[in-house]
Amino acid sequence: MQRYAVVLAAGKGTRMKSKLYKVLHKVADKTMIEHVVNSVQQSGADQIVTIVGHGAERVKDTLGDQSAYGFQEEQLGTAHAVKMAADELKDREGTTLVVCGDTPLITADTLNALVKHHEDNQADATVLSATAPNPFGYGRIVRDEEGRLSNIVEQKDASEAEQQIDEISSGIFAFDNQTLFRLLDKVKNDNAQGEYYLPDVLSLILEEGGKAEVYHTNDFDEIMGVNDRVALSKAEQAMRQRINEYHMRNGVTLIDPSSTYIASDVIIGMDTVIEPGVHIGSGTQIGEDTVIGQYSDINRSTIGDRTTVKQSVINDATVGDDTTVGPFAQLRPNAHLGNEVKVGNFVEVKKADIKDGAKVSHLSYIGDAEIGERTNIGCGSITVNYDGKNKFKTIIGKDSFIGCNTNLVAPVILGDDVLIAAGSTITDDVPNDSLALARSRQTTKPGYLNKNKE
């Protein structure tokens, strides 16, 4: 059976008190709408329609061609929002999921279980419910004496008795697609909020003698809606715990999970150790037997096996196997470190290729450069790559030694087995097997200070 999904993402999110559109706030380094759409995709939806309103273009920029779009100009309720998908889905046969764009913790497994329950029971509609520790603000699941769904009552329309019910509607549904779009036009807005409620479709189904089911999940966190910064923080904590537990169960040691932040798409090999205070952002892959030292920040980068990163910042870079980075190093975009490389304390690398076995141990800037195998860069060495207008490249061959406090003024090429004397400013190319010395000769005047004291 074909499966479709409508993702509701048109609400402005006033309670967030933000200039940023609500579903674009991030949880675990990814926007809420991306989390939801990814889960819907993983659940096997053949087509997704995202309903946008406020901030529509930014949502489209975020999701791109992962979804088709419907536009809700006025926020007149959830049933009205789903109607905006009619052009894409109205005449299709199959099951349609309706999912809220502000439920970033929902998983593909739960969506699949909801659809399976719906289809196995040949229902016209099925609502996903949960037991809430504090049900205030949620629609309540009202059951009849036999435990079957009788109604879904929104908070503002609930009686005192109904407000005591702790089984709540998640706002996530599975519908027979043609039944859904046939009944949407019959939904009325005679309620406390003057809105067209999607749960009223279930009431219409029951009135017609159709079948409406409830599928209950035991994990309330999955269906938690994020409407303000407090809920955003709770979602972040829950997502972080889920992600961290996943990695620990797959052979990764997290010394202090409560202070470790790992994005949802990060890949980490077994027997790697993550120390406290580490942030690993989206698009990062880390190998096996590696140590990521405390307070390191790594984003969109690849780190190899048996490598150690100590208190460093790495963005859009690659680091090979058996390599050491830090402490207090910065790898900027397009920094590429080979195997058995050392980049030490207070070294900055940008758009540079440092080959296997090379060392840049202290207080250096390596930018727009290529460093050959086993070359050693002395303390305080700088590739002078910028003339105020353009960037130029420095190339250093293999097995070379660059003395301390040197300036390599690009464009410049240094060959293999080259020795650059400490304190030199190199402006010309240096051929293989050469010594280059470019500094003033030392002048010493014995007794000079004694003469000045007389």
From Swiss-Prot:
Binding positions (UDP-N-acetyl-alpha-D-glucosamine): 8-11, 22, 72, 77-78, 139, 154, 227, 332, 350, 365, 376
UniProt keyword annotations, A-Z: Acyltransferase, Cell shape, Cell wall biogenesis/degradation, Cytoplasm, Magnesium, Metal-binding, Multifunctional enzyme, Nucleotidyltransferase, Peptidoglycan synthesis, Repeat, Transferase
Chain positions covered by the region annotation Pyrophosphorylase: 1-229
Segments for region (Linker): 230-250
Catalytic activity: alpha-D-glucosamine 1-phosphate + acetyl-CoA = N-acetyl-alpha-D-glucosamine 1-phosphate + CoA + H(+); N-acetyl-alpha-D-glucosamine 1-phosphate + UTP + H(+) = UDP-N-acetyl-alpha-D-glucosamine + diphosphate
InterPro entries xref list: Bifunctional_GlmU (IPR005882), GlmU-like (IPR050065), GlmU_C_LbH (IPR038009), Hexapep (IPR001451), Hexapep_transf_CS (IPR018357), NTP_transferase_dom (IPR005835), Nucleotide-diphossugar_trans (IPR029044), Trimer_LpxA-like_sf (IPR011004)
Residues noted as binding Mg(2+) in the record, renumbered to the chain: D102, N227
Active site (UniProt): H362
GO CC annotations on file: cytoplasm; membrane
Names of the cofactor(s): Mg(2+)
Locations listed in the record: Cytoplasm
Chief location category: cytoplasm
Pathway field: Nucleotide-sugar biosynthesis; UDP-N-acetyl-alpha-D-glucosamine biosynthesis; N-acetyl-alpha-D-glucosamine 1-phosphate from alpha-D-glucosamine 6-phosphate (route II): step 2/2; Nucleotide-sugar biosynthesis; UDP-N-acetyl-alpha-D-glucosamine biosynthesis; UDP-N-acetyl-alpha-D-glucosamine from N-acetyl-alpha-D-glucosamine 1-phosphate: step 1/1; Bacterial outer membrane biogenesis; LPS lipid A biosynthesis
GO biological process: cell morphogenesis; cell wall organization; lipid A biosynthetic process; peptidoglycan biosynthetic process; regulation of cell shape; UDP-N-acetylglucosamine biosynthetic process
Pfam families per UniProt: Hexapep, NTP_transferase
Cofactor note: Binds 1 Mg(2+) ion per subunit.
Superkingdom of this protein's organism: Bacteria
Record EC number: 2.7.7.23, 2.3.1.157
Positions of region (N-acetyltransferase): 251-454
Binding-site list for acetyl-CoA: N385, Y386, A422, R439
HAMAP family cross-referenced by the UniProt entry: GlmU
UniProt similarity note: In the N-terminal section; belongs to the N-acetylglucosamine-1-phosphate uridyltransferase family.
Name of this protein: Bifunctional protein GlmU
Organism, scientific name: Staphylococcus carnosus (strain TM300)
